[in-house]
Structure formats: C-alpha cells, structure tokens
C-alpha cells in the first residue's frame, strides 16, 4: 500500500513538474519565410499597379487625346496587360506565389485612395492639352514606379524565369516612361 501511495505521489509530482516546466516558445519566422513574405508583398504591389495600368487606355473611350499620346497610352496598357497575364501564370504554377498580399499601413492605403480619387476627377473634368499633360504625367509616374519596383524585385528574385520577366518588364516600363516624358516636352 505504501508503494502505491509513493508511486501515485511520484506520478503527481512528475506530472506537475512537466506541466509546470512547459514553456511557451515564441516561434520566430525563418529567414526563408520572411523572404517569401517580402517577395509576395512586392509582387502584390506590382500586380495592383499593373492591373490599374492595363486599363489606362479605357479612358480614351470617353476622352480625346492626340494620336502620339493615345499611342503611348495604348502601349502602356498593352504592356501592363501582358505583364498581368504573366504574373497570373506564375501564380498558377506556384501557389505560394501571392498577388494579393499588400500589408500597407492604413494611412498609406487611405492616402493612395485619396490620390486616386483626386487624379480620376482631374482627368475626367479636364480636356485638351490640360487633360493630355495630366494623363501623360500620371502614366509616366506609374511607369517609373513599375520599372523600379520590377528592378528591386528582380534583384531579390531567385527563380530565373521570374528574374528574366522582371528585368524585361523594368526595361519596357523605363522605355515607356521615357517616351511619355518626351511627349511632355512639347
């Protein structure tokens, strides 16, 4: 009987010791996880921009622009439309490749929404040269951002196919930016 009590007591002490010694360990993301998160956030920003710019030429349905300006806007929309399809294809191949993972601070999101609303109103309620200059300026800025975003992503990318895509996209966006800036000179 004394052995049973001793064994029972020892088991209780052991159980309490094990439960009492259990520690909650913080699980810190691995370097690979952080790298994938940063990559996906960058691609998500690029995808969001590319999606918007792929529809830039739709404004020309209701607004008039001189042929050289309309031509560059259509080139921008076409380039971005192709890039959008390629990014979506990357997502289909690799489900860890995310395109909708932007974690911008709330104030940044609100600021971007306010800018978009203001620019949209300015474009819709302007005409002639004023419209063309504003439209070209917004497109030049968008292509400049896209070119740099693609370059920075490409510098971090390890997948050779995506790396080549990003280098090509950066070059195309830089060319489109330069062409838009040239048109702003006249």
Enumerate the predicted regions with their spans.
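Sec-dependent bacterial lipoprotein signal peptides
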Residues: 1-21
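His/Met- and acidic-residue-enriched segments that coordinate or traffic transition-metal cofactors
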Residues: 21-186
């Amino acid at each position: 009987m004394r052995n049973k009590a001793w064994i029972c007591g020892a088991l209780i002490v052991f159980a309490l010791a094990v439960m009492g010694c259990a520690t909650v360990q913080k699980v810190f993301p691995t370097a690979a996880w952080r790298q994938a998160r940063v990559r996906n956030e960058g691609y998500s920003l690029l995808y969001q921009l590319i999606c918007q710019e792929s529809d830039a030429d739709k404004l020309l349905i209701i607004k008039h622009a001189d042929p050289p300006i309309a031509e560059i806007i259509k080139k921008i929309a076409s380039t971005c439309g192709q890039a959008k399809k390629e990014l979506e294809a990357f997502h289909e191949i690799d489900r860890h490749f995310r395109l909708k993972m932007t974690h911008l601070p709330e104030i940044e999101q609100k600021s971007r929404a306010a800018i978009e609303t203001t620019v949209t109103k300015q474009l819709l309620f302007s005409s002639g040269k004023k419209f063309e200059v504003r439209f070209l300026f917004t497109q030049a800025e968008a292509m400049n951002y896209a070119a740099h975003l693609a370059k920075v992503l490409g510098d971090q990318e390890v997948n050779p196919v995506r790396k080549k895509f990003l280098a090509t996209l950066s070059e195309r966006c830089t060319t489109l930016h330069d062409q838009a800036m040239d048109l702003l000179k006249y």
